[in-house]
């Protein structure tokens, strides 16, 4: 019989179940068993194997009856969510049709991870490529960011019925759903298809749930449960579960009850933290804008304020529709202060864009004299910090043309060489990467376990390269391989990598010593995602202990002080857009972090990992929550905290079974009885309402105790 998730007994049953799985894992680790389960036990980390087993075991109950249809895999970035999902896809492919939904740039990541997994599963096989082709044929890939995503899904499987749906970077899907003004967007159509699907299993992979707003939980858990588990309207959700006065969760106990059984969390266990490099405290560089830059910035702010006033009132009386954040109807037309934020990075009077000319081309045409401390104090400050780095450096900006491309020009002027690939060719066992200066970079058998590694490069040149959303996946993979080469341990091949939001997704980088975030964002999870590109399990294993550190930097443009105080009082903008974004991000981060803590407490591994605050109820077999969330809030909490304790009790045998009892004058009839629960492997109290309770009292009073 499978576990029932909407039940007070489920948390303790889960703890006992996972302990059994862990013991099995340890046995299989040492065995010579060649079964698929044993192979996965040897290939996976223990926290992966726990979820692998629970998800695929009907006894645990996923997909059974009214239980959840899947899991939110909330594992810290760099812990192997992709490997876990592929393991389940392989094991369940004879039952469910695996469909992998991810940004197109990440599809090759899945292929690489699949090959890595195959090598772990079948170390005795010499031709892993044949096994890769065999297994790959079972998978269907869909691009999350494609305009025709719906058509791709239909082509992949006809419908989502009978599918194992794996969504990577799932927070992007949740945000896309609540940012949609109607049901015509890709994200909203996928939501509706998932809600209507029958016999579907779901894996949502993300290291940063609730990154924008706690309301992201609504589409996530509604899709996992297959019903309206959480209220669809923003106002009702916030009224029920958010204390706006304290900026913290409200009715947290009732929300936890609804979420239990749908979350897997791994990330802050001590033994896992030891595998990560040390993240040093964030250095915030507040950089004063130059006079000319600040002048252009103020002009841009005037334009943005005028646009804001022109559109004000259009949506004020419109309440957010179902599954919409307030203001989603107008977000497509919002500038998000793009002008002023880009000028906060770079401003030059020499920059003019001709008709039919791309902004990136205009930046390339600028003379050397345009790239000075006056045009970008931020970048000049960043370059000074980069020169102190003993190893590879990662630079992030969400702006490509007036962010990353400008940084690239500064680097070239400083003498760095751009290794941006123009073409990747395959020639037998050799891969040739043609880069910007026209020379060839040859890599022979360039793989982590390859027998030889040969690079034809000048060791006297310091190089940088870029990965944005426009780069081809093959070129992206080659850059990642070059960065991760043992020959690049201190940046000898690629010293600096510039990435955009799209370019950064899915990157798995080693050896990085500094991360530079060129502008703040109101979503602090974005900054965590960037840092996680190089702060990963095992990413610094090849370095000596003193070098296993990563120093993050954040750059915030502040007003030119001389000009600021020359502006009439009352007309001054007290904080720059950078400062406002940073402060808003910290405020939002506090609320989002509090909700992420709730997800950790509701995770199925919480008690197994010995975490504090886990949802653990007395196993009374009562319903954990009422389907109607408003009525549920009015009802008493059925989850009575479970307290484990050793007590002195007398043994009694009744009808061939052993029980224990205490004389307890504080209880109505003077006795407390306990019976053994084989599921949780512990004794639990027998309630006075149980007919057995009276029978045991009579048995004791008759003087037949053992």
Curated annotation (Swiss-Prot):
Domain (Helicase ATP-binding): residue spans on this chain: 62-227
Any one annotated GO CC term: virion component
One Pfam family it belongs to: SNF2-rel_dom
Xref: InterPro entries: Helicase_ATP-bd, Helicase_C-like, P-loop_NTPase, SNF2-like_sf, SNF2_N
EC nos: 3.6.4.-
Induction: Expressed in the late phase of the viral replicative cycle.
Protein location: Virion
Entry binding sites for ATP: 75-82
Any single biological process term in GO: DNA repair
Function: Putative DNA-dependent ATPase required for providing the needed energy to achieve the termination of early transcripts.
Alphabetical list of PANTHER family matching this protein: DNA ANNEALING HELICASE AND ENDONUCLEASE ZRANB3 FAMILY MEMBER, SWI_SNF-RELATED MATRIX-ASSOCIATED ACTIN-DEPENDENT REGULATOR OF CHROMATIN SUBFAMILY A-LIKE PROTEIN 1
Descriptive protein name: Termination factor NPH-I homolog
Lineage: Viruses, Varidnaviria, Bamfordvirae, Nucleocytoviricota, Pokkesviricetes
């Amino acid at each position: 019989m499978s576990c029932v998730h909407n039940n007070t007994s489920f948390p303790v049953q889960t703890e006992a179940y996972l302990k059994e799985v862990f013991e099995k894992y340890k046995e299989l680790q040492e065995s010579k068993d060649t079964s698929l389960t044993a192979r996965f036990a040897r290939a996976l980390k223990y926290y992966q194997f726990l979820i692998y087993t629970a998800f695929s075991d009907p006894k645990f109950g996923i997909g059974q009856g009214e239980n959840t249809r899947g899991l939110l895999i909330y594992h810290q970035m760099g812990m192997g969510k992709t490997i876990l999902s592929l393991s389940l896809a392989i094991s369940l492919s004879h039952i469910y049709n695996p469909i992998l939904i991810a940004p197109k740039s990440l599809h090759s990541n899945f292929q690489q991870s699949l090959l890595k997994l195959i090598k772990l599963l079948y170390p005795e096989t010499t031709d892993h490529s044949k096994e890769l082709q065999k297994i790959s044929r079972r998978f269907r890939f869909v691009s999350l960011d494609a305009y025709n995503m719906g058509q791709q899904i239909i082509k992949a499987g006809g419908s989502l019925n009978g599918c194992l749906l794996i969504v990577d970077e799932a927070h992007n899907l949740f945000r896309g759903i609540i940012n949609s003004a109607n049901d015509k967007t890709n994200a909203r159509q996928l939501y509706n298809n998932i809600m209507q699907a029958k016999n579907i299993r779901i894996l949502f992979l993300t290291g940063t749930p609730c990154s924008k707003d706690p309301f992201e939980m609504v589409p996530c858990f509604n899709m996992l449960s297959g019903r309206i588990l959480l209220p669809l309207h923003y106002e009702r959700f916030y009224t029920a579960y958010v204390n706006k006065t304290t900026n913290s969760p409200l009715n947290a106990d009732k929300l936890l009850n609804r979420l239990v059984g749908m979350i897997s969390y791994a990330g802050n266990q001590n033994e896992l933290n030891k595998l990560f490099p040390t993240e040093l405290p964030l250095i915030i560089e507040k950089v004063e804008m130059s006079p000319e830059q600040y002048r252009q910035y103020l002009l841009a702010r005037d334009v943005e304020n005028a646009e804001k006033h022109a559109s004000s009132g259009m949506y004020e009386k419109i309440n957010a529709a179902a599954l919409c954040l307030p203001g989603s109807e107008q977000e497509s037309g919002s500038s998000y202060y793009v002008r002023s934020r880009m000028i906060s990075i770079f401003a030059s009077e020499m920059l003019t864009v001709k008709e039919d000319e791309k902004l990136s081309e205009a930046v390339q045409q600028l003379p050397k004299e345009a790239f000075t401390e006056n045009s970008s104090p931020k970048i000049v400050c960043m370059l000074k910090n980069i020169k102190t780095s003993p190893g590879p450096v990662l630079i992030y900006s969400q702006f490509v043309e007036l962010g990353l491309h400008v940084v690239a020009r500064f680097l070239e002027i400083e003498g760095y060489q751009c290794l941006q690939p123009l073409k990747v060719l395959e020639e037998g066992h050799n891969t040739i990467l043609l880069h910007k200066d026209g020379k060839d970079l040859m890599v022979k058998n360039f793989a982590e376990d390859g027998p030889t590694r040969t690079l034809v490069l000048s060791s006297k040149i310091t190089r940088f390269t870029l990965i944005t959303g426009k780069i081809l996946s093959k070129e992206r993979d080659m850059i990642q391989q070059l960065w991760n080469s043992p020959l690049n341990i201190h940046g000898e091949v690629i010293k600096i990598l510039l990435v955009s939001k799209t370019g950064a997704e899915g990157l798995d980088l080693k050896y990085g010593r500094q991360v530079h975030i060129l502008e703040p964002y109101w979503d602090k999870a974005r900054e965590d995602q960037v840092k996680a590109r190089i702060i990963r399990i095992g990413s610094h294993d090849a370095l000596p202990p003193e070098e296993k550190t990563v120093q993050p930097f954040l750059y915030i443009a502040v007003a030119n002080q001389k000009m600021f105080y020359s502006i009439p009082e009352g007309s001054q903008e007290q904080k720059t857009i950078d400062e406002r974004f940073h402060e808003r991000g910290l405020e939002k981060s506090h609320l989002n972090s509090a909700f992420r803590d709730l997800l950790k407490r509701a995770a199925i591994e919480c008690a197994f990992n010995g975490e504090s605050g886990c949802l653990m109820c007395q196993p009374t077999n009562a319903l954990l929550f009422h389907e109607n969330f408003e009525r549920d809030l009015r009802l008493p909490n059925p989850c009575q905290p479970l307290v484990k304790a050793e007590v002195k009790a007398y043994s009694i045998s009744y009808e061939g079974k052993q029980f224990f009892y205490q004389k307890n004058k504080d209880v109505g009839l003077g006795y407390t009885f306990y019976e053994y629960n084989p599921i949780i492997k512990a004794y639990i109290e027998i309630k006075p309402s149980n007919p057995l309770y009276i029978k045991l009292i009579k048995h004791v009073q008759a003087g037949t105790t053992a």
